[in-house]
Amino acid sequence: MATLDNAAIVRELYAAWNKKDMDRVASLATADARVTSVPSGMKMGFREDAEAWATAFPDGEIQAVNVVAQGDYVIAECVGRGTHNGTLKSPAGDIPATGRRVELPFVDCHRLRNGKITESRIYFDTGSMMAQLGLSAGPTATQRPTAPSPEHRH
């Protein structure tokens, strides 16, 4: 698939998500495509991930600021905006709606094969998102700091 075509597919992904057309979103990816949230390590199916964000931010919108394609890879610098009016899935457990507005820059790294997205990795500042939601940006239960080992104590 040509590089320009891959960039167009990713732009179409964001347009479909903005319309909350999850059938179209899913049609742009392979059936086994996975999304990895790099900050948390969470992995979901492609449609499941898109639906999770749409549930958490029903008025959400993605603005693709820069989309760069090279071979099978498309990197998209984006800004996501929306109101947290639904449950947000997180590795520490579900976060109930806060009613707070969020504006979050993020970067998506997509891999495509034969005109379909096969995997995506999303990079974003979880601390900024948690602060905008009015929640602690501290470590989650799975990331609790540990005491230094005896040889590292002063």
Residue positions per predicted region:
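C-terminal and inter-domain tail/linker signature
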Residues: 1-154
